[in-house]
Amino acid sequence: MPTIQQLIRKPRQPKIKRSKSMHLQECPQKRGVCTRVYTTTPKKPNSAMRKVAKVRLTNGFEVISYIPGESHNLQEHSVVLIRGGRVKDLPGVRYHILRGVLDTQGVKDRKQRRSKYGAKRPK
């Protein structure tokens, strides 16, 4: 416990809050180009083949981002838009790819939560 005199000489420093999606640099979304599209397996209690892509952003960073929804049309050199948001059971995946924007198609035959997956309203 510091004395009052010590606090006058050197005041307390506020704690710095670090961003969980620092590569976006305070932007809501960032554009990038896919350098590799592949599947990976989740952490221990879960089992699946999760679709992920390595994306080189316009600011030069290279990040791993998750491709949500069933099936996708992404391949190398596809231009995508990413947002923040981690995938809990995939270590190192801190971003999501937005569906229905730029080169990414929306999820086909999606009826509910369509706006999250870039799907048009069914007729």
Swiss-Prot record:
GO terms for molecular function: rRNA binding; structural constituent of ribosome; tRNA binding. GO terms for biological process: translation. GO terms for cellular component: small ribosomal subunit. Keywords: Methylation, Ribonucleoprotein, Ribosomal protein, RNA-binding, rRNA-binding, tRNA-binding. InterPro entries: NA-bd_OB-fold, Ribosomal_uS12, Ribosomal_uS12_bac. Signal peptide: none annotated. Residues 1-27 are annotated as: Disordered. With S4 and S5 plays an important role in translational accuracy. Part of the 30S ribosomal subunit. Contacts proteins S8 and S17. May interact with IF1 in the 30S initiation complex. This is Small ribosomal subunit protein uS12. It comes from Roseobacter denitrificans (strain ATCC 33942 / OCh 114) (Erythrobacter sp. (strain OCh 114)).
